[in-house]
Amino acid sequence: MSLAADTRRAVRRNPFVHRALRAGVLNYAAAARFLDVGETDAVVAALRRYAEDLPEYETAPREARVTMRSGLGAEDGSGSEGSGADDRESEDALLAVGGVELVDGGSLTGVLATGDVDARALASALDRLAVADVPVVAAGVASETLVVAVERRDGPDTVRIVEDALSAVPEA
């Protein structure tokens, strides 16, 4: 494989480098050392050529209503099939993954965004929450609804962060 191909593959394995290339804010020499795929000057040249082929980094606002719902908990949703209570809980679950459901009755806060949301919007929100050092307990997106579950004390900050993230979601 060529150095250029190795460099592109290394960039794709490190999305933050890819975003920085698209945004035009990358220190090429530092990135070349970080990627460690060959001689620094040659990798710098490969990065510059790759950057020329990439679309510019752009964001767009998403129209969504962001709300907060307190008193949620994560529960094992594998109760006996057909029992009325379990069926009701499953229908009321905000999020269900791998047999665990986010339902009423706990100390978590769910932040919901409804409207123009998708996986890219969720990724943007999760990136910003990670930078803000807000631990996310659970998150998901489906059918124009995004949900992020956090500890109760992090709820208000999470609302603000999600709203801010939705105001500038990176384009593909």
Map each language-model feature to its residues.
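Terminal low-complexity, intrinsically disordered regions
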Residues: 1-54
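A conserved regulatory-domain signal marking ACT and ACT-like small-molecule sensing domains
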Residues: 6, 48-172
